Design a protein with these regions (language model features):
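Cofactor-binding loop segments of dinucleotide-utilizing enzymes, especially the Rossmann-like FAD-
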Residues: 69, 93, 159, 185, ...
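C-terminal hydrophobic helical "lid"/dimerization subdomain
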Residues: 142-146, 188-240
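Glycine/charged-rich beta-loop-alpha catalytic/anionic-binding loops adjacent to active sites
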Residues: 27-38, 176-177
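Glycine-rich phosphate/adenylate-binding loop and adjacent beta-alpha elements
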Residues: 1-29
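Short strand-turn motif at the edge of the Rossmann-like AdoMet-binding core
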Residues: 158-161, 183-186, 213
Length: 240
């Protein structure tokens, strides 16, 4: 790679992530003593979840809706709980049984099955929520705005390649003084903090690992992972 490789700044990106071994400047490495390799592998998506949590600016006693209970949504949910949220609603398809169960385990007060009820029709305790964390497709941003109380914040992440244009009622945003905020993290910057949160027991990432597989089994393992909608959460490649 040349001498310039040693001069790269923190957070650099280059091909080699799936190599069995890689040479990386010591200044770019973060120790994860006291954690398993499986837990350490989740620090990248956890950094994404942390940026979403910070973008939402959750305050004490806020009511929070987590829209989408994949690994990032479930980690952000735990952070919202630790950050002082009064009540947490988690929205997900009823077919994603494992995700819904973990949402309950991590502190969700109510689970909303979005394939059975429209969010706009759900009876929220305060009529709506103060913050919405959107990890579902961006097209749901309009729905998120519709269930926000006055002064609410909708924070979202995710890239939509097929439907990047979203629609929402501008009057709802204007009259209710809502904010729509995008989250785009540089996860590596949060690695030390995320490691501390896991070690302190504030965020449980071990429960998110639903599948493990070795490198040589990647094609078949990933195919099975995508077929297993009921229990699939996070797949981690390991070396036995």
């Amino acid at each position: 790679m040349g001498d310039s490789f040693m001069e790269l700044d923190k957070g650099f990106r280059t091909a080699m992530g799936f190599a069995e071994k890689a040479i990386v400047p010591a200044s770019l490495c973060v120790k994860f003593d006291g954690m398993s390799f499986e837990e350490a592998a989740i620090m990248e998506p956890m950094g994404v979840a942390y940026d979403l949590f910070m973008t939402a600016d959750i305050r004490l006693n806020n009511d929070v809706l987590v829209l989408g209970c994949g690994p990032i949504g479930l980690m952000a949910l735990q952070m919202a709980k630790a950050g002082g949220a009064r009540k947490i609603y988690a929205a997900e398809f009823s077919s994603a049984a494992a995700r819904c169960e973990l949402a309950k385990k991590f502190g969700a007060d109510e689970i909303i099955y979005t394939d059975k009820v429209k969010l706009e029709d759900y009876k929220f305790e305060k009529g709506g929520v103060d913050r919405v964390l959107v990890t579902a497709p961006p097209k749901t941003i309009g729905t998120a705005c519709n269930v926000c109380n006055t002064g609410g914040i909708v924070a979202f992440l995710g890239i939509s390649y097929n439907e990047p244009t979203v629609t929402f009622d501008s009057n709802v945003v204007h009259l209710n003084k809502l904010q729509i905020r995008g989250s785009n993290a540089i996860p590596a910057l949060y690695f030390p903090l995320c490691i501390d949160l896991v070690k302190a027991g504030i965020v449980d990432v071990k429960s998110l690992v639903s599948h493990t597989f070795e490198l040589e089994n990647m094609p078949s393992a990933m195919e099975q992972y995508y077929k297993d909608k009921a229990t699939a959460l996070k797949a981690v490649m390991v070396k036995k």
